[in-house]
Amino acid sequence: MTGDRRLFLVGLSHKSAPIDVRERVALTGDALKAALCELKAMEGVTEALVVSTCNRVEVFVHSDRPDAARRFFTERSPAAADHLYAKDGVEAVRHLFRVASSLDSMVVGEQQILGQVKEAYGLASAASAAGSYFSRLCNRAFATAKRVRTETEIGRGATSMSQVAVELVEKIFGRLEGRAILLVGAGKMGALSAKALAVLGADRILVTNRSPERGLALAAQVSGSYRGWEELQRLLGEADVVIVSTGAPTYVVTRESMHAAMKARRRRSICLIDLAVPRNVDPACAELSDVYAYDVDDMERVVATSKQARQGEAIRAEAIVEAEVMAFAKEREARAALPVLAQLRRHAERIARAEAERTLAQVGGKLDDKGRKSVEAMAQAIVNKLLHGPTSRLKEAASSGDSALPGAAAELFGIENETAGGERREGGAEGAAAAPGAGPVRSQGT
């Protein structure tokens, strides 16, 4: 069943699904690009955006088919169906603005999510899945997030999953000086972890990464040491703490490798923190004696205190988000009137042109060029004067959020309302504004 084209969101996050469900539908690299192409090819979908992070996978589509995004999930993992949430229209807009502003994050106020949403939009644009609608929507979301960041102190305290992980390590071990801390992965999460460790006084930071160049660069930034990827097994036997965050789709630390490492450690305990989704550390490692393993879902309990401390700032941030959502909706309503105005003008000019041609045909050759132009100018002047009032009132109504008047005007004048229901053809509104009619009345005859 089809309807009006608008924004639809279907997704799951740390709030609705455990990590073992989220990792089944997580999308990265080529899989994410393929997903965008698949969504764009769905019947009724004009634009698509996918936000996939360690804590959420969300699909946004501009479509007239409410079930398009849901089918995308259920076809990949039937188990995801029980964990999905769905929003549309203004509610979907509000959700994206809250996500970009880190108000829906596990760590409220964290800075990474805005970059991740920007990256998601960049990928969608590069894949030709995002067009004019998502350009307006996402840029407004980014501006909202910037306001939240600059007008509140929502980012105060531990504001990334990596920082939370490092604070957990500090709570477990106390002082970090002298502790051997191994970072497996030198991407964004690894870099954030390294910096947070250095701030807390860690002085034995080891880095291993599949790409030596990236690993060497990160180790140098924090006065640490780089070790080759082939040394991972030996390093598991030496480190007190292992923080894992690679882009690998499978485990890089298995139960078997950890079992062998514990033999070499002679029962010396180890802390494993897995910040990756899909997980990089086999959950079965936690079954081994003296192995203390944590994944991203375990971090939620750690951040509870930090979240409570920022509650007041979160309330201020929510007010900013709400104001921006309403402003975006109001602008959309104003744009909704533009195609109706363009059609109304074209409709009036067609009638005026036909009447001018009929009049000129009746007078035959009695009028010279100047006379014919006078008739055409008179017809155009009548159109302009008749439409001046309705045009002004339509624009005023749209600016005040009245979406009913454009539809009523279309019905009253007997023209098709291309924007009935709100956003159905929002992508073409700018074009209609740029070319609001067929031009001045010109006779097609003599």
From Swiss-Prot:
Substrate binds at residues 53-56, 105, 110-112, 116. Gene3D superfamilies: Glutamyl-tRNA reductase, N-terminal domain, NAD(P)-binding Rossmann-like Domain. GO terms for biological process: protoporphyrinogen IX biosynthetic process from glutamate. Residues 431-440 have a biased composition (Low complexity). The keyword NADP applies. It is an enzyme of class 1 (oxidoreductase). Residues 409-446 are annotated as: Disordered. It catalyses: (S)-4-amino-5-oxopentanoate + tRNA(Glu) + NADP(+) = L-glutamyl-tRNA(Glu) + NADPH + H(+). The record marks 95 as: Important for activity. NADP(+) binds at residues 185-190. Its EC number is 1.2.1.70. One of its GO terms (molecular function) is glutamyl-tRNA reductase activity. Pfam families: GlutR_dimer, GlutR_N, Shikimate_DH. Possesses an unusual extended V-shaped dimeric structure with each monomer consisting of three distinct domains arranged along a curved 'spinal' alpha-helix. The N-terminal catalytic domain specifically recognizes the glutamate moiety of the substrate. The second domain is the NADPH-binding domain, and the third C-terminal domain is responsible for dimerization. Belongs to the glutamyl-tRNA reductase family. During catalysis, the active site Cys acts as a nucleophile attacking the alpha-carbonyl group of tRNA-bound glutamate with the formation of a thioester intermediate between enzyme and glutamate, and the concomitant release of tRNA(Glu). The thioester intermediate is finally reduced by direct hydride transfer from NADPH, to form the product GSA. Catalyzes the NADPH-dependent reduction of glutamyl-tRNA(Glu) to glutamate 1-semialdehyde (GSA). This is Glutamyl-tRNA reductase 2. The lineage of its organism: Bacteria, Pseudomonadati, Myxococcota, Myxococcia, Myxococcales.
